[in-house]
Curated annotation (Swiss-Prot):
Function noted in UniProt: Sequence-specific transcription factor which is part of a developmental regulatory system that provides cells with specific positional identities on the anterior-posterior axis.
Organism: Heterodontus francisci
Any one GO cellular component localisation term in the record: nucleus
Protein name: Homeobox protein Hox-D12
Main subcellular location: nucleus
Positions of the DNA-binding region: 204-263
PANTHER family referenced in this protein's UniProt entry, alphabetically: HOMEOBOX PROTEIN HOX-D12 (PTHR46440:SF1), HOMEOBOX PROTEIN HOX-D12-RELATED (PTHR46440)
This protein's record includes keyword DNA-binding: yes
Gene for this chain: HOXD12
Highest taxon listed in the record's lineage: Eukaryota
Keyword line: Developmental protein, DNA-binding, Homeobox, Nucleus, Transcription, Transcription regulation
Similarity comment: family membership: Belongs to the Abd-B homeobox family.
Length: 272
């Protein structure tokens, strides 16, 4: 026969008629240091006396619930996930299940569910070719963005070319882009025609109209009389010689410059 240690958790639990040690840890040991006098008047141990000595496993046969918690020397367990004070957990512990294993299995089950949920939505680059893509869910703007080098095309996303809806969308987008380009840039085959709907890019130079001998003679006589003419005299010459006012003005300017060059040449020749 082995001695029953009063500090053994299994012995205390058997005296108090507890099926699991959770009520002894949490329900009866209060933070203010109250005793177990309400449930068992024979026990006069305080919280300090109980917590000062380490709990060791007894060689006696103890219930599986007390054997699972016989190695702990703490009065309070900080891990609230593995051990719960719920009544439902204590009922399962009485049936022979360990609550810490149950909660760890539950947490691992939640992790597996999260992994499955994340795998159900793969990235664009990891979409296998066997995935059936419903073409009715995708509109033509998605196809256009993929044609213009969108992120789906950069990440290696390949459209199913066998689907007729996608092929029709590609053809329509290509034809639309070609029609827009043709409307923006009009075609002009001949630039020298000078047509109103296709103006020439380079402005053609006006053909020079030479002066007649009669016009030159009249202008020379007027220049010998007066090198500088006013507006009224210029108007009379233009009307008489059938010339524009601008032509008369330019001819007088050129004639003055010609006379100046002749004078400078005579001066240079006289020096030598």
């Amino acid at each position: 026969m082995c001695e029953h240690n009063l500090l053994n958790s299994g012995y205390v639990g058997s005296l108090l008629n507890f099926t699991s040690p959770e009520p002894f840890y949490f329900a009866n040991l209060r933070p203010n240091g109250t005793q177990l006098a309400t449930l068992s008047p024979a026990l006069s141990y305080t919280r300090r006396d109980v917590c000062s000595l380490p709990w060791t496993s007894s060689p006696c046969a103890s219930p599986p619930q007390s054997r699972a918690f016989s190695g702990y020397s703490q009065s309070y367990l900080s891990n609230s996930v593995s051990i719960s004070i719920n009544r439902h957990v204590s009922d399962k512990a009485a049936a022979g299940e360990e609550p810490n294993k149950y909660y760890f299995q539950d947490s691992s089950r939640k992790v597996e569910e999260r992994c499955r949920h994340n795998q159900s939505y793969p990235s664009d680059a990891s979409i296998p070719s066997s995935v059936n893509i419903n073409p009715a869910k995708y509109e033509y703007p998605n196809v256009e963005t993929s044609l213009h080098g969108s992120s789906l095309h950069n990440q290696g996303f390949e459209l199913n070319s066998n689907s007729p809806t996608v092929n029709d969308g590609i053809k329509q987008s290509v034809s639309l882009s070609m029609s827009l380009q043709s409307s923006v840039t009009p075609v002009c085959n001949r630039s020298s025609d000078g047509l109103p709907w296709c103006p020439t890019q380079v402005r053609s130079r006006r053909k020079r109209k030479p002066y007649t001998k009669q016009q030159i003679a009249e202008l020379e006589n007027e220049f010998l009389a007066n090198e500088f003419i006013n507006r009224q005299k210029r108007k009379e010459l233009s009307d008489r010689l059938n010339l524009s006012d601008q032509q008369v003005k330019i001819w007088f300017q050129n004639r003055r410059m010609k006379k100046k060059r002749l004078v400078m040449r005579e001066q240079t020749l006289s020096l030598f």
